[in-house]
Amino acid sequence: MKQPFCAPAAALRRVLDAAAALPRPAVEILPLEKACGRIAAKALCARMDQPPFDRSPLDGYALHSADTAGASRETPVTLPVTMKLYAGDAPAAALPVGCAARIMTGAPLPEGADCVLMQELTDSGEETVQLYSSLKPQQNVVLRGGDIAAGAIIAAEGTPLTPAHLGVLAGQGYAEVPVYRALTVGILSTGSELLAPGEPWAPGKIYDANGIQNAARLGQLGFAVQRRHCSDDPEVIACQLRELLTGCDAVITSGGISVGQKDYLPAVLERLGAQMLFAGVAQKPGSPMLAAEIAGKLVFCLSGNPFAAAATLEQYAVPALLRAAGRREESCILPRTTCTLTTGFSKSSKGDRYLRAKAAGGSVTIPGEGSAEAHSSGSLSAMIGCNCLVKLPAGSGPVAPGEEVEVLYFVY
């Protein structure tokens, strides 16, 4: 089962292709208020123009623009006011030439009117109105279909629905939408040293931070999670994996994948008939990571070191799981850009290295003043507040503030 370490780009391609080849999740219909973050199961299109009529964006007077010619404070134009319109009204008649309609914000323009003069540029008259400014056609008018035209795609199939999507859909009269069923991911932390959070601490033991962090990250992305931890016993690990594979759509493990005497996961995967996608990635941290498919379900085996687990979760497991969940591939991959370092990093990088970081406004900060110690694979606290990874390519020397580096933003 031993294979050469896979290049990061090739590893990502393999898991994305494997995820794309899986059957799409079942479709369910959800009310809009429960659909935020869920993935559209078909293209959702505008049912009508929005706005559905020409409307006023302000309080004032709807007019024929030709009737305002020459109007100014020195030479006002006076017109009779023949109707009044509020938001929600439907004009009962067209606006005659040479007349004005009192109109409020959001109200539809009557037929014939082609502009709106704000009330501050009038005497605010009720029976007649003096106009203090001339207007051009379509001035101060929100045109029918100006926001979105009937038939336009609001959310393509595979799009995660945001509050903005849902607001636009509600404005189109949608009450419910078809979405893909949320996938359930099993989280298995392995290690006889692990305690569940809340258990009394004992010498030689540590708490299961990976399980909580991995489960929380997947929950943030809309996955349902089943979380467990077990001892370094190959029979127990195999039993737990079988159960999770039965009840879940995919599984993520942490720990037990390196070359230690109790690193049993590679052998357990082989026993379970795993088809390996890759066994090891040529990078730091997280090089021992494994990815496989068992009975049509993806399995990702991460390092037990907290940051190594976090980095490879973001780089490989999250994109593949989002793809399997029905997202379009382009929204699964970590967005890349170039930023300027505000802090340096003191080590050379023989292979590709990824550092947790905080990016904003074209700058990126490596926590811990860029010290190598703060970025050991076992360090967890430096991850707080980070929103990206800085990539230092193979062969890089130490980097200093002011240098340009490649940044990979976490996916949301």
Which stretches of residues belong to each language-model region?
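Flexible glycine/proline-rich
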Residues: E28-E33, G37, K42, G88, ...
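Short, glycine/charged-enriched hinge/interface segments at domain edges or termini
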Residues: K2-Q3, A62-R228, E373-A374, L389, ...
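Helix-rich terminal scaffold detector
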Residues: M1-A9, V177-L302, P306-T312
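Predominant activation on well-ordered alpha-helical scaffold segments within soluble catalytic domains
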Residues: L12, L16, D59, Q119-E120, ...
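Electropositive phosphate-/nucleotide-binding environments in soluble metabolic enzymes
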Residues: K2-A9, R13, I29, E33, ...
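Short, low-complexity N-terminal leaders and the immediately following helix N-cap/first helix
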Residues: M1-R73, R327-Y354
